[in-house]
């Protein structure tokens, strides 16, 4: 069995030799049989049983000449035609970059976080976005309705920003995490720098909402001074004194390739319940963070097709 077969999506469990569930395997076996009946696959049909080990063995035997792992199964026509998005995109970890030290792309980051939205029902990820996100209405960040998020059970928010604008090639990834229930807003830059002004403006909007929820009556929040600077190096404004707004001042990254992995790692550790202070105070160096790629991703290889 390939190691890639054990890299289940975060809300799936590897059991009885597979990340596929019994329901998945039955669906796949039924589709296989239909392709046999239509003459598109030359093989014996699979006996359908409510037995995961049986179905796994039967599919393995029929696919062993073209697939040396179960990830390859998802590339076969009889499975792709099911058009089951959860099966195709949320059984295994997403594809990672080709090189061990290759930068993470927007797609890599979004693919990872999309799977964690399925694991954590109270989590909403707003995407890996350029620094001019407020000028791009389709991203939906400038006009976030925090009341609606709270009402829908989405209390944990994640953002990954590239410090280049949308028309540029990309420079450095950073991350922001907020827990609306706990009134926490945490920023992480693997270089330990103060957040860029446009990120601070977003922090201001989230902070105002959290502060108003806890400290303002419905008709009094308009009196709140919104001109204060946020995330200053050595002092906090009135709102920051009441809620938990922090950014890291210490540098973790010293090499050139891991800012995207640092950003993923920060948000995922927050979702897992690790304290912000523990994350920022205990440096995780580049080589250690690079190892997380083997957890967050599977790695591409060419596939054959069954005939």
Name each model feature, range by range.
Residues 1-174, 180-185:
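Cysteine protease catalytic domains with a Cys-His-Asp triad
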Residues 15, 21, 36, 117, ...:
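Compositionally biased, intrinsically disordered low-complexity regions enriched in proline and serine
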Residues 21, 105, 196-199, 285:
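A diffuse structural propensity rather than consistent per-protein peaks
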Residues 24, 112, 120, 137, ...:
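Generic alpha-helical secondary structure signal
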Residues 112-116, 202-209, 295:
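Residues that form generic nucleotide/phosphate-binding pockets
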Residues 151-274:
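Cysteine protease-like catalytic core of ubiquitin/ubiquitin-like
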Residues 266-307:
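Contiguous terminal or domain-adjacent regions
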